[in-house]
Amino acid sequence: MKIAIGADTDGFELKEHLKNYLKSKGIEVIDKTPEKGINLVKSASLVAQAVMNKEADRAVAIDEYGAGSFMVGAKHKGIICAEVSDEHSAKMTSQHNSANMLAIGAGIVGKRLAEGMLDAYIAEKYAGGRHQIRVDMLNKML
């Protein structure tokens, strides 16, 4: 699995931590914002585009509260973005919504919780079935 990760200035420290965490677990990470100072819209767009272009399987965008990255991610065709701040939501959005992008707020979650959220998101597989109707509806919106 390849994960694209990026952050604005407020999320940069958490992004660096999570990038190293994922690499330590053997996951290939594509850092779309290697330099600090990229704004929220640009950073979230870069990770969304990595999934759209099939450079990455999933994406993680980090800003101060997660809401901005969520709004940007949701504007991209083929992206199902979920703003999460707990492990259960990260698991369920993968299982029920086939989310291919997470938006995380560095001002909301700490490093350990963010690690747990990524673990839950990555480990969970999309269930399909009755949830496919919703996913199809989401994919037709843009």
Curated annotation (Swiss-Prot):
Which chemical reaction does it catalyze? aldehydo-D-galactose 6-phosphate = keto-D-tagatose 6-phosphate
Primary enzyme class: isomerase
Q: Does the keyword Isomerase apply?
A: yes
Q: Which UniProt keywords apply?
A: Isomerase, Lactose metabolism
Q: Which Pfam families match?
A: LacAB_rpiB
The biological pathway it contributes to is: Carbohydrate metabolism; D-galactose 6-phosphate degradation; D-tagatose 6-phosphate from D-galactose 6-phosphate: step 1/1
UniProt key word Glycoprotein: no
Cite the GO molecular-function annotations of the record. Answer: galactose-6-phosphate isomerase activity; ribose-5-phosphate isomerase activity
For the biological process aspect of GO, one term held by this record is:
lactose catabolic process via tagatose-6-phosphate
Q: List the EC numbers from the record.
A: 5.3.1.26
Q: Which HAMAP family match?
A: LacA (MF_01555)
The similarity comment for this entry is: Belongs to the LacAB/RpiB family.
Protein name as annotated = Galactose-6-phosphate isomerase subunit LacA
Identify the species of origin. Clostridium acetobutylicum (strain ATCC 824 / DSM 792 / JCM 1419 / IAM 19013 / LMG 5710 / NBRC 13948 / NRRL B-527 / VKM B-1787 / 2291 / W)
